[in-house]
Amino acid sequence: MHYYLGIDCGGTFIKAAIFDQNGTLQSIARRNIPIISEKPGYAERDMDELWNLCAQVIQKTIRQSSILPQQIKAIGISAQGKGAFFLDKDNKPLGRAILSSDQRAYEIVQCWQKENILQKFYPITLQTLWMGHPVSILRWIKENEPSRYEQIHTILMSHDYLRFCLTEKLYCEETNISESNFYNMREGKYDIQLAKLFGITECIDKLPPIIKSNKIAGYVTSRAAEQSGLVEGIPVVGGLFDVVSTALCADLKDDQHLNVVLGTWSVVSGVTHYIDDNQTIPFVYGKYPEKNKFIIHEASPTSAGNLEWFVNQFNLPNYDDINHEIAKLKPASSSVLFAPFLYGSNAKLGMQAGFYGIQSHHTQIHLLQAIYEGVIFSLMSHLERMQVRFPNASTVRVTGGPAKSEVWMQMLADISGMRLEIPNIEETGCLGAALMAMQAESAVEISQILNIDRKIFLPDKNQYSKYQHKYHRYLKFIEALKNLD
C-alpha cells in the first residue's frame, strides 16, 4: 500500500493528514496558527513559527499512525490564497507574512477604485480588487515601508513558503498565483504590464517560476526531514489554492453543480472550460488543475469566523449544544438581523458587523440564530451572482465546518431553495493536496477516489417563503448600513 501526505494551511489551523492510495484517511494532526493583529486591520503571521507548527503536525500525524515515513510516496500542500510571504536575498523571512484578511491597504484599494483601474486590469487578470491581494500589499509596503520593500528578494504565497521550507526550491503554484493580479489569465504567465499598472514594476522579477499543481517542485531536504520526522528525498508537488482543493474534492464536473465552502470565508465555486466575455459581472477566474479548465468563484470573509468570534467572546458551550438550541426556535421567526462583517464585507469596502432588531424578550440563542442566518444571507449574494454564470446549477455541494450542522444546512437549503449534497469528506484541503501528490507519483483517477456517499438536504417550500421575507429585510438593513458612513 502506498501513502501520501496532504498538508492544509488555513486561516486558523494547519493540518497534516496521511491517506492511502484509495484516498482513505489514515491519520491527521492539527494545530492552531496564531494570527498577529497589533494594529487595527492587521493580520500577520510569524513565518518561522508557521514552519515549526507545520513540522510539528507532520511529526504528530506520522507518530500516531502505524505508517513509517519511508512509506510516504509524495507530499502536497493546500493553503489559503492571496496574502504575501517575503524572503530576503538569503532566503530568510523578511518580516511577518501578511495574510489575505489584512486590511492595511484599504486606502490604496479605495484610491484604485476611484481611478477605475479595474477596467484596465480585469480583462487581463479576470480578478477584482482586494486589500489582501499581493499587489495591494506590495503597493502598501512600497509607500509605507520603503526599506523593507527594497529588501524583498522573493514573493511567495503560503503554500509556496512551506514547500520551500521542505525542499529549498522556489516556485509559485499556478492555481494560487493565477489569482494574484500578477498573472495574465489568457496567456497563462506573469505580465509586467500588470506590475506597472499597480505601481510595483520592480516586483515582477521577484516572482519565482510557476509550477503546476501536480508537478514535482523538489524533494524533502535532510534538514526538513530532521525537523519534521519525514525522510529525505520524498517528492513535494506544487499543491493547490484551498478553494480549488475543496472544489476538486466536491467533484465538480458540469454546470449543474456548485461548491459552497463555509469556513473563515464563504466561497461559491463552479468549474468551466471557457472564459465568457459576454458577462457583465466581473467574475473571478482561476486556473484549475485539470487541462483547459478554470475555476470561477465568489468569496468574502463573512462566514463561520463570525460565529467562532461570538462563541469565544462569551465562552459558550460546544457547537452541538448551540445547534440543538437553535433547532428549537421557529425558522425566520425572530426580528434580529446580523451583518457578518467582522473580518470584511461583501457589501461595501470597510463595512463593519452588527446586530439590528434586538428586543427585550430576545435571548442569546436568538443572537446565535441571527448569526447563522446572517452568514447564509450574506452567502446568497455570491450564490445569486454565480447562478447568473451557471444558470443550470440546481445542486450545491457544501464543505467546511458548518456542513456538520444539520440545522445550518437545512437553513441554507430553505433560504436558497436548492438541493444540498454534503460529501462525506472532512478534510478537503488535505485530501486535495494528497490527490495532487498521487497524480505526480502515479496515474490516478480522481473521480474513482471521490465516489463517496453524500448526505442530502432538500428545501422546504413553506420555510423558503418565510426566509424570503426575512432575507429582503436583511438586504434593506445592509443597504442602510452602506449609507451610514
UniProtKB/Swiss-Prot annotation:
Gene Ontology molecular-function annotations: ATP binding; L-xylulokinase activity; phosphotransferase activity, alcohol group as acceptor
Among Gene3D superfamilies, the record links this protein to: 3.30.420.40
The reaction(s) annotated as catalysed by this protein in its Swiss-Prot or TrEMBL entry are: L-xylulose + ATP = L-xylulose 5-phosphate + ADP + H(+)
Instruction: Spell out the InterPro entries in the cross-references.
Output: ATPase_NBD, Carb_kinase_FGGY, Carb_kinase_FGGY_CS, FGGY_C, FGGY_Carb_Kinase, FGGY_N
Mind telling me which Pfam families this protein's record contains? FGGY_C (PF02782), FGGY_N (PF00370)
Per UniProt, the enzyme's principal EC class comes to transferase
List, alphabetically, the SUPFAM superfamilies matched. Answer: Actin-like ATPase domain
> Which keywords label this protein?
ATP-binding, Kinase, Nucleotide-binding, Transferase
Q: Which domain of life is it from?
A: Bacteria
| Entry EC no(s) | 2.7.1.53
Q: Which Cys residues form disulphide pairs?
A: none
Q: Does the keyword Hydrolase apply?
A: no
What the entry lists under PANTHER family is as follows: L-XYLULOSE_3-KETO-L-GULONATE KINASE (PTHR43095:SF3), SUGAR KINASE (PTHR43095)
State the family it belongs to.
Answer: Belongs to the FGGY kinase family.
Assembly and interaction partners: Homodimer.
What name does UniProt use for this protein? Probable L-xylulose kinase
Organism the protein comes from: Haemophilus influenzae (strain ATCC 51907 / DSM 11121 / KW20 / Rd)
